[in-house]
Amino acid sequence: MQRDIMRYLNPSLRDIAAYSVEGGQQAAIKLNQNESPFDLPMWLKDAIVSEFVREPWNRYPDILPYRGTKAYADFLGVPAEGVMMGNGSNELLYTIFLACLGPGRKILVPDPSFSLYEKLALLLQASLVRVPLKASLDFDVDAIIQSAQEESVDFVVLSSPNNPTGKSITFDDIRRIASSCDALVLVDEAYIEFSRQDSALPLIEEFPNLVVLRTMSKALALAGMRIGFAIGRPELIAEIAKPKIPFASSRLAEITLMHVLENYAIVTDAVSYILNARDELYGELLSVQGVEPFMSDTNFLVIRVPDADAVFRKLIGRGILVRNVSGYHLMKNCLRFNIGLPDENSRLLDALLAINGGMA
């Protein structure tokens, strides 16, 4: 018997595509997911595993991971009651969106921005207010404030630094938005360690409607561990945490986080390398004919080329995997790639020079 299974499901699923990574996740030079090029050193992994094997594997972890939460709160110098740890910042986005949105409620998102924001808004049947970026891919702060006020939005989500553009909002402009909008304001700081702008964290003391999101997947090189944090006023975090999945963070994730925070020089050294390599590669790309690089506040660069699809395919043919972000608003013929190891950056640059010269 034939049945239309969609009639059993949330009708919003018709408007949502499954998440996918064009080109896959395997390549000789993998630069498409904004990962750190550095894995943890083996001596640190050994210390983490040595502690983890002494944990009881037959017992559930804590409902909320208090050890990891306290470790990160102490690292930031904020009260642990104002910090929520999750299984990656994406899990926390699900949690926060569930807490804030539903049918009839409005969310404002700059466009383009991280694709998960729109997906979650559609899934929760909220009304989406898109505010286009400027042609330079910078945020249009005045338009954000005006739209938030005119549309009476309930929720404003700002990716700063922004994925996929690499641009940041200034500290003062975030203050303007938080003070001008009668809405919860979420600042997703996944790439803040690479930014020229200051974090919005100090504004939490000033604005009870502000939440800052952090991930350990980028600067801390823990993408495989799935660790993220939301930081806000304790009374706000207590409410936002209500729809959170219990037991979502593993003991291994907590132990790993604590060891990395105790050895944070590893992170600062990696960030220093990435910043220097980013600026060096940006400067070299300026001299490549037919390639327009954009300044970045992240661990990745965006370039515009005459034909992004063709360049993307030719790079794959050379074993180099980047991200084709041409489908985003204002980003026609744009490619995105994270900073890799020195040899990877050199091979990418050489490939772009060769492709631009007409070589296959």
Curated annotation (Swiss-Prot):
Pathway: Amino-acid biosynthesis; L-histidine biosynthesis; L-histidine from 5-phospho-alpha-D-ribose 1-diphosphate: step 7/9. InterPro entries: Aminotrans_II_pyridoxalP_BS, Aminotransferase_I/II_large, HisP_aminotrans, PyrdxlP-dep_Trfase, PyrdxlP-dep_Trfase_major, PyrdxlP-dep_Trfase_small. Its EC number is 2.6.1.9. The keyword Acetylation does not apply. GO terms for biological process: L-histidine biosynthetic process. CDD domains: AAT_like. Pfam families: Aminotran_1_2. One of its GO terms (molecular function) is pyridoxal phosphate binding. Belongs to the class-II pyridoxal-phosphate-dependent aminotransferase family. Histidinol-phosphate aminotransferase subfamily. PANTHER family: HISTIDINOL-PHOSPHATE AMINOTRANSFERASE, HISTIDINOL-PHOSPHATE AMINOTRANSFERASE-RELATED. This is Histidinol-phosphate aminotransferase.
